[in-house]
């Protein structure tokens, strides 16, 4: 099976709901990124960043990296 690398269907849901990615991918590290936060530019194949707004809703398509 092809490994999923992005989750466009999660835009607009809460970070808590989006953490279901963990059920699809074992060993993945979820990082929630609040508005105005700085993130490193490094790439990690086991990391998914959830960019959220003030309401904790995902604002960008989560993806591997």
UniProtKB/Swiss-Prot annotation:
Superkingdom classification of source: Eukaryota
UniProt xrefs under Pfam families: potato_inhibit
PANTHER family with a match to the protein in the record: PROTEIN, PUTATIVE, EXPRESSED-RELATED, SUBTILISIN INHIBITOR 1
Keywords, alphabetical: Protease inhibitor, Serine protease inhibitor
Glycoprotein is among the record's keywords: no
Record keyword DNA-binding present: no
Site description Reactive bond, residues in chain: 41-42
Family (UniProt): Belongs to the protease inhibitor I13 (potato type I serine protease inhibitor) family.
GO MF term (any one): serine-type endopeptidase inhibitor activity
Identification of the protein by name: Subtilisin inhibitor CLSI-I
Stated role: Inhibits subtilisin-type microbial serine proteases including proteinase K, subtilisin BPN', subtilisin Carlsberg, subtilisin E, A.oryzae protease and S.griseus alkaline protease. Weakly inhibits pronase E. Does not inhibit trypsin or chymotrypsin.
GO biological process, any: response to wounding
């Amino acid at each position: 099976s092809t490994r999923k690398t992005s989750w466009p269907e999660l835009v607009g849901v809460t970070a808590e709901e989006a953490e279901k990615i963990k059920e699809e991918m074992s060993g993945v590290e979820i990082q929630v990124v609040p508005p105005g936060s700085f993130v490193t530019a490094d790439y990690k194949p086991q990391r998914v960043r959830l960019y959220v707004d003030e309401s904790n809703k995902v604002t960008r398509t989560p993806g591997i990296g």
